[in-house]
Amino acid sequence: MLVNVYVLVSVIFLINPLLGILLGASCCLDYKQSKYGIYLLIWMLAIYMAFINATKIPLSDMLEYQKVFFQAKEYGVVDYIQLNGKEPIFYALTYICYYLFWGNWDLYVMFLTLLYYLIINYSIVLFGKKCSCSSLSIVIALIVGAFFFQIFIMTGHLIRQCLAEAFFIYFLIRKFVIKRTSWWVAILALGMHSSVLPLIGISLLPQIKRSLTIKEFLKGVLLLVVLALVFFLLESVLSSVFFLAYLYSRVGSENLLGKDVWQTESGVGGLGILLGIVVVFMIFSIKRKMRLYDNGNIVNPLINNCLCLIFVLCILSICEITTLVYSYPIIGAL
């Protein structure tokens, strides 16, 4: 019976994607005992957003990605990665995709968008199930994640940063919720965009593993400031390291310290401040409501997010890292 329903929903999705997504969401609520409905919704949302992104006219950073994509036919894989000289995993993936999709740019964009939303959506479901969230809560979080404007606009503009963000959030979920430190996920995030390195560092702070108190929170912020100072003081030594060299160059560039028009028009700065307030409120609300339980599984990822937000909000002009902020409210929607 359920299989027939899912097949029907899938067919409707092919005819009318939005109606199919609506029916898929309804199936998740009606058939709570089945896990397949929620995974069907994950795929429908990801496929829908992938097709929309493929219709976008490449602008700004995407023009550069398009140029790099078509360069794959001119070089061998090693020369191609060395030519770009940064984020080897992303460019190795791009090289493979060029031949896998017969040099079709639209299919490449669809694949990267699909990959991004699948990782984000799967992370939401893992978090929701581990924390015993209701089916309604998980569905709402998935819908918010798919149709949140600032997230969507960046998936068609700063795709490397978005993929790094997705892998980073999945790393957080595995580390703090599933209790498995999957370094391979962190490496994938770094291989997509090195700007995620400070955020991975934040996730390793000892305060992240402890119950939230004002004292621990302030200690975490202070430690973060100290680490940032050490990072800049050791620039002459660390800038020779492959990954860190690019990160230092970005920190010192005008591109890092300026905002694009799309960021100003979409309210990136103001929304970042608002999200910071919301995340802080969520942390203390959850702590207050769950005093009788071991709330580390839920609170610790939010502590990490809050520290990341403080790091970003102190220097709102850092475009590369503000990109990573906007998926955090998805967890809060649960």
Regions found by a protein language model. Name each.
Residues 32-78:
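Extracytoplasmic loop-helix module adjacent to an early transmembrane segment
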Residues 58, 63-66, 72-75, 91, ...:
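Alpha-helical transmembrane segments and terminal signal-anchor/GPI-anchor hydrophobic tails
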Residues 63-70, 80-103:
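Short hydrophobic/aromatic helix or loop-helix immediately within or flanking a transmembrane segment
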Residues 111-131:
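Transmembrane-helix motifs of polytopic, lipid-linked glycan transferases
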Residues 124-147:
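Transmembrane-helix signature of polytopic, membrane-embedded enzymes
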Residues 153-169:
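Multi-pass, polyprenyl lipid-linked donor-dependent membrane glycosyltransferases
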Residues 168-181:
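Membrane-interface transmembrane helices that cradle and orient dolichyl/undecaprenyl
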Residues 181-204:
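Membrane-interface alpha helices of multi-pass inner-membrane proteins
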